[in-house]
């Protein structure tokens, strides 16, 4: 991922968060599940890191959702794409205004160079799939090394099927869903844009990388079309 790496669809009129909600069925439910699961892991004086945080929506949810029992965690969102920077700045200002006690920071950098340490929770929501394949394992290894014992890595990824017939059926079912919100020309244009950016793994490949990084198991907790959300514990 270069410094010029960016998402053109982040500039859409409806905004990125609404766009992804209309693109991935059940996206809001996924975020709700992640927030609920986070309460089992977030601890005071530890780092809670969301890589590829886009607009910072999940980071803000962590701050609000964990404040009643864990007020002194350090919340970090990491984002590389400049299209999100203005909204991240606005969200950071709002969080500090509404929750002046919160220790929250958005770092505009490449996660491949991030020093994970003292982490009780790391999240990655549809981020690994945009990284060069050669870098994904190293990032997972760094995450594992930076997690405290008992800490969790919660992630969501677009996957591909190992069976081509199933892949075709699920893909067209997914397109049928998207047609409820987007014109066919918009869907095609986005597919062209993402073709050289988004290169998903199979679920078995993801499991294999996690195991090699040190995680003993990864448990899926959310699925829709070819998208999967899962949790791995150190």
Language-model segment annotations:
Residues 158-211:
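C-terminal alpha-helical "lid/dimerization" subdomain adjacent to the S-adenosyl-L-methionine
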